[in-house]
Design a protein with these regions (language model features):
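A short alpha-helical cap/connector motif
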Residues: 1-123, 130-149, 156-192
């Protein structure tokens, strides 16, 4: 299947699914198309060959990342806890033809992040359970390469859920931050 057609299908599926589901864990909570476009541009302009995504869902955002890293001969490692979402993501990676550029890790990010290589990622995309971001920060900080970029989704729409952590990171002299009004708000955190 053509990648653009698959992306459009997943956008429609996500909107339809999320409008019918009440429970948060049953929602796909996909990024917006303009967020996907931004991620693609960020990966390519930074030359990010090693990308980490925390929160795969059905793989829609991963497709944007994988399409970009393919051009750079890079790779995306993505983490998802929910088994049903992993099954859908795996299927979508196969259908897209991008599976060779993606490694899907099954499990809890709290357990998996410590197993990943120090300074191993030029770009990390964080779109998961926001209540854990503060606890994950030491590991994310460890994983981010020099001049690496962390992109945090929902930074405007759900700012109240992570404002303390955002303030903490914003005061760290090793990082510079910017809030970008794309999609539901993307918070960019660059290691200096």
């Amino acid at each position: 299947m053509e990648l653009e057609q698959l992306k459009r299908q997943l956008e429609q599926l996500g909107e339809r699914n999320d409008s019918m589901q009440q429970a948060r864990h049953r929602k796909l909570l996909n990024i917006t198309r303009d967020t996907g476009e931004l991620l693609s541009v960020l990966v390519q302009t930074r030359g990010a060959q090693a990308v980490l995504e925390i929160g795969t869902s059905n793989g829609y955002s991963t497709l944007w990342l994988a399409e970009a890293v393919r051009r750079l001969e890079g790779h995306v490692t993505t983490i998802e806890l929910d088994e049903d979402k992993r099954v859908h993501a795996h299927d979508n990676f196969q259908r897209s033809g991008l599976a060779p550029w993606v490694t899907l890790l099954a499990g809890d990010a709290s357990e998996l992040l410590p197993t990943l290589p120090q300074a191993g990622y030029q770009l990390i995309f964080l779109d998961s359970d926001r209540q854990h971001y503060r606890a994950w920060w030491p590991q994310i900080r460890r994983l981010l390469a020099p001049r690496g970029l962390l992109v945090v989704d929902n930074a405007i729409s759900h700012r109240s859920e992570m404002v303390e952590w955002m303030n903490e990171v914003g005061q760290d002299p090793a990082f510079a931050t910017s809030l970008v009004p794309v999609g539901k708000g993307e918070w960019l955190v660059v290691r200096l």
